[in-house]
């Protein structure tokens, strides 16, 4: 069956559904890498700037959207900056299991399904629940790559269903005012 549109799962409804020991057939998290670029702490000490992709609304982001955004940012940075010149981390983890009450839409389907009887739904995917102000992507880089980092995060944000903003600041200035916003 095809994947439902993101608008079906964008809003948070009800409590999180995360307990895998009670969920039979819960899909695996299909994001192979959460850390990209230069991952060693010694090499990351040379990166003085930090960029963050921050979500502006509360909602859910499916794992397909997170993976598409990760691939867009990773491919752009690998091509134009080089893997040795940045560190990129995906912060949002899709723990919430999405359910779907599949409805058949063909001739004779009324004899095959139960309609709204026992309509709890079966596991259909996963999503990350995010709050306003939460960081989706975190990146460290050198000052000469500011334009490329902004473009990579902008491209990643086009794959996400919620509005986002880019915050660039000096490393270690976590609570201070942002240097640049895009």
Swiss-Prot record:
Keywords: Ribonucleoprotein, Ribosomal protein. It comes from the Archaea. GO terms for biological process: translation. SUPFAM superfamilies: Ribosomal protein L16p/L10e. PROSITE patterns: RIBOSOMAL_L10E. The keyword Acyltransferase does not apply. The keyword Ribonucleoprotein applies. Pfam families: Ribosomal_L16. One of its GO terms (cellular component) is ribonucleoprotein complex. Gene3D superfamilies: Ribosomal protein L10e/L16. One of its GO terms (molecular function) is structural constituent of ribosome. CDD domains: Ribosomal_L16_L10e (cd01433). Belongs to the universal ribosomal protein uL16 family. This is Large ribosomal subunit protein uL16. It comes from Pyrobaculum neutrophilum (strain DSM 2338 / JCM 9278 / NBRC 100436 / V24Sta).
């Amino acid at each position: 069956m095809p994947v439902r549109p993101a608008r079906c799962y964008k809003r948070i409804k009800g409590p999180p559904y995360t307990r895998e020991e009670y969920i039979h057939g819960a899909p695996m998290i299909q994001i192979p890498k959460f850390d990209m670029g230069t991952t060693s702490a010694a090499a990351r000490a040379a990166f003085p700037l930090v960029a963050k992709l921050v979500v502006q609304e509360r909602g859910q982001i499916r794992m397909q959207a997170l993976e598409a955004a990760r691939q867009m940012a990773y491919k752009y940075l690998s091509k134009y900056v080089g893997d040795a010149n940045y560190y990129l981390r995906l912060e949002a983890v899709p723990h919430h299991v999405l359910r779907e009450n599949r409805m058949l839409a063909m001739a004779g389907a009324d004899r095959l399904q139960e309609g709204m009887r026992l309509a709890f739904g079966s596991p259909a995917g996963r999503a990350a629940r995010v709050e306003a102000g939460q960081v989706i992507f975190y990146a460290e880089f050198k000052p000469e790559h500011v334009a490329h980092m902004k473009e990579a995060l902008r491209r990643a944000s086009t794959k996400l269903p919620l509005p986002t903003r880019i915050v660039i600041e000096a490393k270690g200035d976590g609570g201070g005012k942002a240097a640049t916003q895009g």
